[in-house]
A protein has these predicted regions:
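Ligand-site clamp/hinge motif
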Residues: 92, 208-258, 300, 416, ...
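N-terminal lobe/hinge region of extracytoplasmic solute-binding protein
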Residues: 1-83, 90, 113, 180-182
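Gly/Pro-rich hinge or "lid" segments in bacterial periplasmic/extracellular proteins
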Residues: 56-66, 113, 157-217, 221-224, ...
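Detector for C-terminal structural segments
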Residues: 31-33, 47-50, 54, 193-198, ...
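A structural "hinge/loop" feature
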Residues: 13-14, 33-50, 74, 101, ...
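Surface-exposed binding/hinge segments that line
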Residues: 90, 125-168, 184-193, 338-353
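Aromatic- and charge-enriched surface segment that lines or borders ligand/interaction sites
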Residues: 17-22, 42-50, 77-121, 136, ...
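Extracellular/periplasmic solute-recognition and catalytic clefts
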Residues: 132-135, 190-201, 226-290, 297-301, ...
Length: 568
């Protein structure tokens, strides 16, 4: 999309994959919660882990060591005019579903039309920009795009999963199902224990095993996901050897939980993996659809009352860094950078959308002295609450006109979130704010998330160096009231919409970077979330028979490039 591909025509394999990696063995991974469907492409149900990665294939494969390039997979070649107004995919004649049926243009067209009409909101939003579909031949399809100028659309279509038309109808597609799904990917479904586990088996007849994008990947004969009721039980399963690999996101466990005999004698390995990706945004997210959070002064005040320095020291062994941007840890971040001329031009039609300190690069998350008091930030927070109409009455913060207390519920879907949220709730209670924590099971949490039935949640929006149409799904006004979107906050901001459009229209690296930074500034100025923290590296633990490559991609840990060492 921007720049030149990293790999030339005729390349043999991705640099982060070892073409000599041995095949064989089984790897077992852990998941928390449960599942009730094998279909991850619809909004209904709680999908099982792994279908998208192991069973379905997309038209083209992403290169994980560059942000804007995809290479041939189901589509052997692609044609595109300079203005990116259309894209033509030429299907590899060898491409097959796991039942042996060839993949044809009819499967590709069926996939697009079905996902556009009945898929998840992100598919519906993106594929509706296809205004015409041409069946060029049995093995070629052309998609023609609308006049919106979205230059990412060829990559969006290249990322589309290909569904078997001979096994599905639009009606059967949108049902939740536990019947094994047929795809064209490297694995098939070998066993299902509803809600408890799923096992994938490497397909010995996989049509694409020798493609350059696949060499050195998909090395395990079996991949099994075991489900556990909570993270603590899952961690015990790893320590006892039931699970083979674990990605850790709990600093307390990383700091001390892996001091076990198996690690001390070398049977368990821990590693910290560098990643070239932005850290993304992990945050406490306000549901601005709720009246209590519609005043940005209230949101800013609550942000000021989050005592990161104390939380990091007390709960997380000081292992986290504060997140200052939606594109933290990358050149796309606006933090500490004054807006350039391009950004100012983009933002000029929205003079009130960005705070002066954000525009000038002076904005920072509030800092405390690391004690449990946070007095200076509390004084500024109460000034903002007062401006918003709140007063102290009998030790409670209430609105001076309605007498409604400043109070809300923070919804959590796992016990892991309880420590942080309970700490924040306790701090707010000392200041007369009636926050409360509610923990529900995974199924109920996902259901309430889809319907925006919460006041506040702890959530995360991952990021990459190629932000695009996923930003529409997260922040655009059109998705604020669409069930199942990732616009958890309910953002309805014309400046946000405009900046997303500009990043999608950008033709060069500089224009793209300026548009992303401008979007970052508008989101930060809106105080839609309380930014939390991030680790500087990925934390991965594994039993030593599971081995990984010496070179990692920008994305860091990718299980599909690991293997079993039979000697260990």
């Amino acid at each position: 999309m921007h720049g030149a591909p990293k790999y030339p025509a005729g390349f043999t394999h991705f640099n982060y994959a070892d073409p000599n990696a041995p095949k064989g063995g089984r790897v077992v991974l852990g998941q928390t919660g449960s599942f009730d469907t094998l279909n991850p492409l619809i909004i209904r149900g709680e999908p099982v882990a792994g279908i998208r990665e192991w069973v379905y294939e997309t038209l083209m494969a992403r290169g994980f060591d560059e942000p804007f390039t995809m290479y041939g997979l189901v589509a052997k070649s692609v044609e595109m005019p300079p203005d990116r107004s259309s894209v033509t995919f030429h299907i590899d004649p060898a491409a097959r579903f796991s039942d042996g049926k060839p993949i044809t243009a009819d499967d590709v067209i069926f996939s697009m039309e079905t996902l556009r009409e009945r898929g998840r909101p992100n598919h519906r939003n993106s594929y509706k920009k296809v205004v015409r579909t041409d069946r060029v031949s049995d093995l070629a399809v052309r998609f023609v795009f609308d006049a919106s100028g979205d230059r990412e659309m060829p990559l969006i279509m290249a990322s589309m999963p290909v569904l078997p038309k001979h096994l599905l109808t639009p009606e059967t597609f949108e049902r939740t199902t536990l019947a094994p799904i047929v795809g064209s990917g490297p694995y098939t479904i070998a066993a299902i224990d509803a809600g408890r586990s799923i096992t994938y088996k490497r397909n010995p007849d996989y049509w694409g095993r020798d493609l350059p994008v696949n060499r050195g990947r998909y090395n395990f004969d079996e991949i099994r996901y075991e489900y556990f009721r909570d993270m603590s039980v899952q961690f015990e399963a790893f320590k006892s050897g039931v699970l083979d690999v674990r990605t850790e996101d709990d600093p307390k466990l990383w700091a001390s939980g892996y001091d076990i005999p198996a690690r001390r004698d070398g049977r368990v390995l821990t590693r910290e993996i560098e990643t070239g990706l932005p850290a993304g945004m992990s945050a406490l997210a306000f549901n601005t659809r709720r009246p209590v959070f519609q005043d940005p002064r209230v949101r800013r005040g609550l942000l000021l009352l989050f005592n990161f320095e104390w939380v990091n020291k007390t709960l997380y062994h000081g292992l986290y860094k504060r997140t200052e941007s939606f594109f933290e840890r990358s050149y796309l971040s606006s933090a500490g950078r004054p807006a350039d001329a391009r950004e100012r031009e983009l933002l000029a039609p929205f003079p009130d959308a960005v705070l002066p300190e954000v525009m000038e690069g002076r904005y920072r998350m509030p800092v405390s002295d690391g004690t449990g008091h946070n007095r200076e930030n509390a004084r500024e927070a109460f000034r903002l609450f007062s401006e918003a109409g709140y007063v102290i009455d009998g030790g409670r913060l209430v609105h001076k006109d309605t007498r409604e207390p400043l109070g809300f519920e923070i919804l959590a879907g796992s016990s892991v979130q309880q420590r942080l949220i309970a700490s924040y709730v306790s701090d707010l209670a000392k200041l007369g704010i009636a926050a409360r924590l509610r923990v529900v099971d995974s199924s109920q949490y996902q259901s309430r998330l889809k319907d925006y039935d919460y006041d506040m949640i702890q959530t995360a929006w991952p990021s990459s160096l190629s932000p695009g149409n996923e930003q529409v799904f997260r922040w655009d006004s059109r998705n604020a009231d669409v069930p199942g979107s990732f616009n958890f906050v309910g953002v309805k901001n014309p400046a946000v919409d405009a900046m997303i459009n500009r990043l999608l229209e950008a033709e060069g690296d500089e224009d793209f970077t300026s548009a992303v930074r401008a979007l970052d500034r508008v989101l930060l100025s809106g105080h839609y979330v309380i930014p939390l923290f991030h680790a500087s590296r990925q934390w991965v633990a594994n039993w030593k028979q599971v081995q990984g490559p010496k070179t990692f991609s920008l994305w860091g840990y990718n299980l599909d490039t690991w293997w079993i060492d039979g000697q260990k």
